């Protein structure tokens, strides 16, 4: 039996459906609504031209913004959404408006975070206004007015500082004069007022000292005799000894501590240590602490050179065989163990190079049959009887 298709009497096509539409069931949409991807079909039998069923769709989209066929992007406040293939604007709901406002707030916050904080310190006063840029004559006038004021302020500060320094120096000079009463105080602010040499200044200071002696009434006695030698040693050390008389120099030398006492306080440097070592080495030559020290000491005394680890000399046999020698005389332990001839160099010739003839004589032996022949002593060893 063939199934009778359900005829929808509200269909604008008057029930004329194709077989392809029956095989593919589609969701039933409300009447007078076109599918989202299809164009609006005009209704037949209508008066006043074709009518598009988009007014109802726009109303439904305003109620439910998630309907199929809506704009795929959020609408801004200054934009108007239009339905696809229609000329009707889409009405935005309150939810979309609130979402747009939130997006604007977020974008403003991000811009504020990205902007660096340039005004970290309070704004400082500027010497010119913005309008002065367009009036260079006025700007030059302002600058000319500011320069003397700045110079005047600097002069005032320098004068105030100079007065403070002078007052402090005057107080110090008063204290020094009260303690010494005879020693002329040096001017620390301007020691060489007329750019004179120190020698000329010293010559000028000499009459001042003579005047102070005459004023105190102690011409015959030397300087500082009236005070009873109550002047501190620091001031006495500052006095140049060239300007003093011979009697004054002797008195200053007696009051100053002796140089050997200062030498004992200081730590000894390297130079005194080296001197002590050289003196001790010249008095007693260094002898290595070995078993052969007693045997090797006479050679050192005869040669006049101190024996060290580098300058030790063994027997000639050990030197030829390139072995370590214990330097025991008359026979070393190595030669006695191997029963070799332990020969020692002549006194005074330990550190001298051997002549060529002597080397040839040492390397040759008298043979009974062959006579005088050369021998390689490093390889062939002849045992003594």
UniProtKB/Swiss-Prot annotation:
Record's note on what induces expression: Regulated in response to carbon source, temperature, growth phase, and physical environment. Expression is up-regulated by rapamycine, and thus is under the regulation of the TOR pathway. Binds its own promoter and is also under the control of EFG1.
Biased composition (Polar residues): 1-19, 52-67, 88-97, 170-200, 279-291
GO cellular component: nucleus
Subcellular location: Nucleus
An example Gene Ontology molecular-function term: zinc ion binding
Subunit structure: Interacts with EFG1.
Protein name: Zinc cluster transcription factor CZF1
Organism this protein belongs to: Candida albicans (strain SC5314 / ATCC MYA-2876)
């Amino acid at each position: 039996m063939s199934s009778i298709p359900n005829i929808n009497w509200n269909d604008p096509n008057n029930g004329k459906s194709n077989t392809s539409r029956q095989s593919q069931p589609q969701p039933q949409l409300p009447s007078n609504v076109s599918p989202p991807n299809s164009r609006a079909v005009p209704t037949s039998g209508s008066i006043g031209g074709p009518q598009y069923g988009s007014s109802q769709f726009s109303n439904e989209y305003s109620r439910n913004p998630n309907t199929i066929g809506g704009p795929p992007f959020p609408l801004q406040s200054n934009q108007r959404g239009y339905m696809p293939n229609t000329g009707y604007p889409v009405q935005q709901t309150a939810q979309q408006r609130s979402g747009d406002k939130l997006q604007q707030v977020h974008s403003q916050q991000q811009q504020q975070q990205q902007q660096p904080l340039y005004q970290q310190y309070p704004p400082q006063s500027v010497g010119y206004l913005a309008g002065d840029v367009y009036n260079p004559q006025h700007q030059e006038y302002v600058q000319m007015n500011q320069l003397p004021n700045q110079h005047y302020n600097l002069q005032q500060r320098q004068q105030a500082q100079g007065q403070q320094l002078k007052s402090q120096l005057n107080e110090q000079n008063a204290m020094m004069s009260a303690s010494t009463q005879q020693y002329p105080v040096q001017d620390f602010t301007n020691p060489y007022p007329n750019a004179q040499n120190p020698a000329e200044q010293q010559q000028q200071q000499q009459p001042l000292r003579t005047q102070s002696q005459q004023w105190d009434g102690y011409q015959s006695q030397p300087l500082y005799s009236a005070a009873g030698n109550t002047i501190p040693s620091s001031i006495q050390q500052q006095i140049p000894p060239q300007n003093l008389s011979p009697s004054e120099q002797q008195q200053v030398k007696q009051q100053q501590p002796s140089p050997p006492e200062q030498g004992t306080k200081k730590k000894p440097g390297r130079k005194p240590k080296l001197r002590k070592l050289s003196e001790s080495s010249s008095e007693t030559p260094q002898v290595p602490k070995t078993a052969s020290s007693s045997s090797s000491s006479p050679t050192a005394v005869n040669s006049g050179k101190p024996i060290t680890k580098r300058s030790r000399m063994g027997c000639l046999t050990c030197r030829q065989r390139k072995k370590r020698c214990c330097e025991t005389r008359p026979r070393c332990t190595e030669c006695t163990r191997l029963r070799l001839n332990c020969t020692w160099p002549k006194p005074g010739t330990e550190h001298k190079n051997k002549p060529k003839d002597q080397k040839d004589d040492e390397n040759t032996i008298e043979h009974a049959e062959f006579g005088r022949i050369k021998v390689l002593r490093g390889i062939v060893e002849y045992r003594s009887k």
